[in-house]
């Protein structure tokens, strides 16, 4: 049987949780005393979906209590932030909740895992959740992939998005561009270039293929505009002078081939070219 994410991260299974909470007291906690989870990977909540949930709660009430823990003088949400937001929008004063004891590591893991099992996270939110799980549990990308039942390349590709400029990450969070758009921008190593192409994507409503072509064009333009490396100019000498210089060099070579050690220096002065030949008196 496939193990749940929770059990793989050293936490109780949801089914075990249900059995444990069956006998736990459901309390009515004041909305004003409840704060969101600090480790919540979801940074943007769909207001329309929250409004729909609020309407359902108005009609049927909160069927499943939220789960919280005591932190300082407040209750921090562990699971159920959407329900809490919906009830808050209804301006109700209390919400049914179960108070549990969890440390920071457990609280973060539950929040991250719960959200990873839901749909609707943006690629950046998902990448942030992976990064936090790796940090909290001291995992490698490979071991995290195994625990989540995903390919290592999937984890790696998501994490690369976190190296993009904040402007690009914000565009993903706001769903202005897709993950595939963002991955095309990764090829541009320069943040300024990435932001420039991002602007084109949004203003011109480029699709992924057009974005990839724009990235290729950016590379081509940059290459054409880059200053060409000039080859050092070879100094030109009159023909007679070149013959004389080569004759001296050949003569030195002949002497050296005879076994005699010869030291030479050449110096190009403004008015003359100087050869210095030194022949030691002693071998």
UniProtKB/Swiss-Prot annotation:
Function: Effects nucleoid occlusion by binding relatively nonspecifically to DNA and preventing the assembly of the division machinery in the vicinity of the nucleoid, especially under conditions that disturb the cell cycle. It helps to coordinate cell division and chromosome segregation by preventing the formation of the Z ring through the nucleoid, which would cause chromosome breakage.
Cell compartments where the protein resides: Cytoplasm, Nucleoid
Keyword annotations: Cell cycle, Cell division, Cytoplasm, DNA-binding, Septation
This protein's GO CC annotations: chromosome; cytoplasm; nucleoid
Family, similarity comment: Belongs to the ParB family.
Disulfide bonds: none
The protein's name: Nucleoid occlusion protein
UniProt superkingdom: Bacteria
Swiss-Prot/TrEMBL GO biological process terms: chromosome segregation; division septum assembly; positive regulation of sporulation resulting in formation of a cellular spore
Any one GO MF annotation of this record: DNA binding
The keyword Cell cycle is annotated on this UniProt entry: yes
Species of provenance: Shouchella clausii (strain KSM-K16) (Alkalihalobacillus clausii)
Residue ranges flagged as DNA-binding region: 142-161
Pfam families noted in UniProt: HTH_ParB (PF17762), ParBc (PF02195)
Predominant cellular place of this UniProt entry's protein: cytoplasm
């Amino acid at each position: 049987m496939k193990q749940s994410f929770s059990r793989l991260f050293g936490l109780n299974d949801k089914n075990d949780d249900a059995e444990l909470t069956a006998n736990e007291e459901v309390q009515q906690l004041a909305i004003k005393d409840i704060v969101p989870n600090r480790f919540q990977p979801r940074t943007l909540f769909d207001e329309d979906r929250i409004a729909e949930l609020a309407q359902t709660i108005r009609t049927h009430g909160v069927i499943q209590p939220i789960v919280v823990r005591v932190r300082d003088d407040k209750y921090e949400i562990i699971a159920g932030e959407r329900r809490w937001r919906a009830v808050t929008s209804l301006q109700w004063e209390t919400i049914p909740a179960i108070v549990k004891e969890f440390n920071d590591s457990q609280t973060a893991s539950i929040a991250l895992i719960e959200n990873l099992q839901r749909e609707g996270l943006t690629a950046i939110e998902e990448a942030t959740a992976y990064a936090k799980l790796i940090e909290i549990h001291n995992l490698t990308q490979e071991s995290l992939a195994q625990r989540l039942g995903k390919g290592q390349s999937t984890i790696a590709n998501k994490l690369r998005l976190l190296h993009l400029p904040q402007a690009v990450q914000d565009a993903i969070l706001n769903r202005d561009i897709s993950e595939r758009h963002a991955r095309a921008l990764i090829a541009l190593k320069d943040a300024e270039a990435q932001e420039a192409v991002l602007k084109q994507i949004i203003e011109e409503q480029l699709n992924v293929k057009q974005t990839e072509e724009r990235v290729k064009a950016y590379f081509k333009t940059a290459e054409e505009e880059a200053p060409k490396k000039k080859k050092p100019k070879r100094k030109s000498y009159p023909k007679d002078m070149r013959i004389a210089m080569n004759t001296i060099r050949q003569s030195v070579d002949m002497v050296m081939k005879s076994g005699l050690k010869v030291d030479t220096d050449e110096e190009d002065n403004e008015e003359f070219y100087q050869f210095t030949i030194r022949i030691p008196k002693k071998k």
